[in-house]
């Protein structure tokens, strides 16, 4: 994800944007990385002093810093109209949070991008946050269910805008703009291939590794 972010910022070096990360440690690491590559960047998280948070926020609002790297502590009450992109380098815990944070891009009505970089370890981080919270078990279960929906969003082939609208109980046509709508890859039914793999594993009594299974399926004569 670091490589993607660096390449993206190089292509959009004159644009203002927000990069969200799930932990203070990750915010500070990303900020150091971007400064090392000479990007105009500020950071925001709850561990900074009130004065430092205010300064960094103002630097971003008045375009003295083009990019803000932040936890979800940043954004409430912020109305910066010319944000051209919002990148989530870590998956949020709920689709509501993602929708709210991604919606900080393009408030001036001009074309903008919302990008989610999905990594399994970030889902595990969200699991940790839920477990460490002082919520009761019923509330924790609801949070796990919301995280599951967020994971479904990250993996769906449906129009992303439709997915969000459906989640909030609304209907709408495909947007024609999201990465799924613009994906030109051809869908392929792999049911038969999957059945062959599972059958081979079963016939080999589930005792051999994936390399030998692959050799058998490809007709290799290796003994």
Task: Describe every region a protein language model picked out.
Residues 1-137, 142-145, 170-173:
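Helicase motor core with emphasis on the C-terminal RecA-like subdomain
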Residues 35, 42, 65, 108-223:
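Non-catalytic terminal extensions of ATP-dependent helicases
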């Amino acid at each position: 994800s670091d490589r993607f972010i660096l390449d993206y910022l190089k292509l959009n070096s004159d644009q203002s944007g927000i990069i969200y990360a799930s932990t203070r440690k990750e915010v500070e690491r990303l900020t150091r990385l971007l400064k090392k590559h000479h990007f105009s960047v500020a950071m925001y998280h709850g561990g900074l002093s009130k004065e430092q948070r205010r300064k960094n926020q103002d630097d971003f609002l008045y375009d003295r810093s083009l990019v803000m790297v932040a936890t979800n502590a940043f954004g409430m009450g912020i109305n910066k109209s010319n944000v051209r992109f919002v990148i989530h380098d870590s998956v949020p815990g709920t689709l509501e949070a993602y929708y709210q944070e991604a919606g900080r891009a393009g408030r001036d009505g001009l074309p903008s991008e919302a990008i989610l970089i999905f990594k399994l370890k970030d889902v595990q981080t969200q699991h940790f946050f839920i477990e460490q919270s002082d919520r009761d078990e019923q509330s924790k279960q609801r949070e796990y269910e919301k995280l599951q929906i967020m994971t479904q969003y990250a993996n769906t082939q449906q129009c992303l805008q439709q997915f969000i609208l459906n989640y909030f109980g609304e209907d709408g046509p495909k947007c024609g703009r999201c990465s799924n709508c613009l994906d030109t890859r051809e869908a392929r039914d792999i049911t038969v291939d999957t059945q062959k793999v599972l059958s081979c594993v079963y016939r080999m009594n589930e005792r051999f590794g994936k390399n030998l299974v692959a050799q058998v399926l490809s007709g290799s004569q290796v003994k």
